[in-house]
């Protein structure tokens, strides 16, 4: 299988060294080897010094899989946002790439590769997973950082303010605001205040919550009680404010 290459094992920042770990890439077993969970990348090498290495930004998911129906042994499951293939598969893929793009212009699905790391000691899965989490956190998704920078608030320039170069908004008190109204505006404001005053004075609240006028008259033999709403009726309701 030509996806394996020779490279020196990582020496710095190794959080977890797991010998006797079988690698299964895309359903094909590669035999036992050593898994290196390092801060820079995730690497696996067999006894001949051949293996593969993954960069953390390319890893979209890692988890402990205990579902023996999906795979007969418990393992560390890793999903990669690329297609790991041998040399023959890569050449065939490159030959058909243009034809596939012309036929499937609307297909935006990203190729993925499923990798399973099966340790000899299943009790080590928890520490393997924790080491993966720690190393993955050192390589945040750059798209998340870009989304955080999409909105930037206006900066307050202290130096410009001291030099009088900043337009400071003008605020008025209620009385000062009235003095800036035109005659027509003052008349409109007075009319609105009168309407609001009349509306409050004639307020009648239905559903038995509160009334300031006479109680409702019975109609068609039905008794309408002008009482408080039953306490606790909506205590469990989650209201968005």
UniProtKB/Swiss-Prot annotation:
It is found in: Cytoplasm, Cytosol; Nucleus; Cytoplasm, Cytoskeleton. Keywords: Cytoplasm, Cytoskeleton, mRNA processing, mRNA splicing, Nucleus. Residues 97-112 have a biased composition (Acidic residues). InterPro entries: ICln, ICln/Lot5/Saf5, PH-like_dom_sf. It comes from the Eukaryota. GO terms for cellular component: cytoskeleton; cytosol; methylosome; nucleus; pICln-Sm protein complex; plasma membrane; spliceosomal complex. Residues 88-112 are annotated as: Disordered. It holds the Pfam family Voldacs. Involved in both the assembly of spliceosomal snRNPs and the methylation of Sm proteins. Chaperone that regulates the assembly of spliceosomal U1, U2, U4 and U5 small nuclear ribonucleoproteins (snRNPs), the building blocks of the spliceosome, and thereby plays an important role in the splicing of cellular pre-mRNAs. Most spliceosomal snRNPs contain a common set of Sm proteins SNRPB, SNRPD1, SNRPD2, SNRPD3, SNRPE, SNRPF and SNRPG that assemble in a heptameric protein ring on the Sm site of the small nuclear RNA to form the core snRNP (Sm core). PANTHER family: CHLORIDE CONDUCTANCE REGULATORY PROTEIN ICLN, METHYLOSOME SUBUNIT PICLN. Belongs to the pICln (TC 1.A.47) family. This is Methylosome subunit pICln. The gene is clns1a.
């Amino acid at each position: 299988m030509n996806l394996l290459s020779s490279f020196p094992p990582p020496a710095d920042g190794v959080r977890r060294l797991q010998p006797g770990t079988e690698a299964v890439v895309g359903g094909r077993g590669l035999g036992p080897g050593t898994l290196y969970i390092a801060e820079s990348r995730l690497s696996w090498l067999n006894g001949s010094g051949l293996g593969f290495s993954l960069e953390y930004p390319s890893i979209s998911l890692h988890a402990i899989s205990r579902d023996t129906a999906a795979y007969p042994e418990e393992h560390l499951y890793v999903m990669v946002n690329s297609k790991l293939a041998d040399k023959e598969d890569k050449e065939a893929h490159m030959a058909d790439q243009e034809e596939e793009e012309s036929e499937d212009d609307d297909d935006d699905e990203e190729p993925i590769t499923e990798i399973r790391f099966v340790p000899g000691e299943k009790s080590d899965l928890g520490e393997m997973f924790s080491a993966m989490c720690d190393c993955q956190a050192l390589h945040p998704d750059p798209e998340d950082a870009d989304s955080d920078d999409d909105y930037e608030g206006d900066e307050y320039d202290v130096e410009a303010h001291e030099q009088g170069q900043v337009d400071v908004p003008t605020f008025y008190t209620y009385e000062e605001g009235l003095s800036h109204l035109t005659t027509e505006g003052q008349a409109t404001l007075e009319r609105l205040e009168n309407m609001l005053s009349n509306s409050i004075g004639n307020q009648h609240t239905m559903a038995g919550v509160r009334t300031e006028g006479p109680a409702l008259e019975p109609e068609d033999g039905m008794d309408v009680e002008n009482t408080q709403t039953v306490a606790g009726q909506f205590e469990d309701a989650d209201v968005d404010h």
